[in-house]
Amino acid sequence: MTSLKLLKEKAPLVICITNDVVKNFTANGLVALGASPAMSEFPADLEDLLKYAGGLLINIGTLTDENWKLYQAALKIAEKYNVPAVLDPVACGAGEYRKKVADDLINNYKLAAIRGNAGEIASLVGIDVASKGVDSAGVDNIDEIALAANEKFNIPIVVTGEVDAIAVNGEVVTIHNGSAMMPKVIGTGCLLGAVVASFIGLEKGQELKSLETAMLVYNIAGEMAEKRPNGHLPGTFKVEFINALYEITDEDVKKFKRVK
């Protein structure tokens, strides 16, 4: 099984093209975990960096026409160097323009995984689910949404919510770990996309196990952070979550994981 120890040993360079709100939080989270983030947004620089990268994150949160072109350029370069790319289609269910961009990136470029909340992923496959931009209401059929997207796009899918679902090659697992504090801190979902990009390329052909490990590490770190003094307060939780990502071990994952 793909392990946190393996990630720390490889310390993959992860290129994060993400939204302006979360860049600092994302970079610090990846460093704490053991990956090496680069927040580059210049195509010529990306050509140099992606030669050595272990993963690429495309997060469409701060969407502009210029950024759309940047996403396309980055994905072309990533495919050239066989770098696994993860798409976070932020708020793609909130409007036609975002949906158009997400559809373009999914249909015309090579992706290793898509990570989104239930509302975002449901919108990609035409399932009607209540969604509020980057947030999504509690959804009972999250595993069905993940499977529908996996079957439609033939791409590994991670759907997040009160329960998380991972679908790869028609197989679905659900993750029942996590903290209720996560949605109260802006950027936790976006950082998760970067964590997925850190794990997805560690072991070829082991995408399901890699994604499962990524989700467990992330969610159990959230549980650890919430249990610490004042972890029920969002400001403290944010700091303690970074600390927990730094301290969590494979033994913690084995002890506390809840997978179905």
Curated annotation (Swiss-Prot):
GO molecular function terms attached to this record: ATP binding; hydroxyethylthiazole kinase activity; magnesium ion binding
Q: Where does substrate bind?
A: M39, G187
Record keywords: ATP-binding, Kinase, Magnesium, Metal-binding, Nucleotide-binding, Thiamine biosynthesis, Transferase
Q: Which GO terms describe its biological process?
A: thiamine biosynthetic process; thiamine diphosphate biosynthetic process
UniProt keyword tRNA processing, yes or no: no
Primary enzyme class: transferase
- Reactions accelerated catalytically: 5-(2-hydroxyethyl)-4-methylthiazole + ATP = 4-methyl-5-(2-phosphooxyethyl)-thiazole + ADP + H(+)
Q: What is its EC number?
A: 2.7.1.50
Cysteine disulfide links: none
Named cofactor requirement(s): Mg(2+)
Where does the source fall among the domains of life? Bacteria
Q: Where ATP is bound, by residue?
A: R115, T160
Q: Which SUPFAM superfamilies match?
A: Ribokinase-like (SSF53613)
Biological pathway: Cofactor biosynthesis; thiamine diphosphate biosynthesis; 4-methyl-5-(2-phosphoethyl)-thiazole from 5-(2-hydroxyethyl)-4-methylthiazole: step 1/1
Fetch the NCBIfam families from UniProt.
PRK09355.1, thiM
- What function does the entry list? Catalyzes the phosphorylation of the hydroxyl group of 4-methyl-5-beta-hydroxyethylthiazole (THZ).
Protein family according to the UniProt entry: Belongs to the Thz kinase family.
Q: What is this protein called?
A: Hydroxyethylthiazole kinase 1
* Biological source species: Streptococcus pneumoniae (strain P1031)
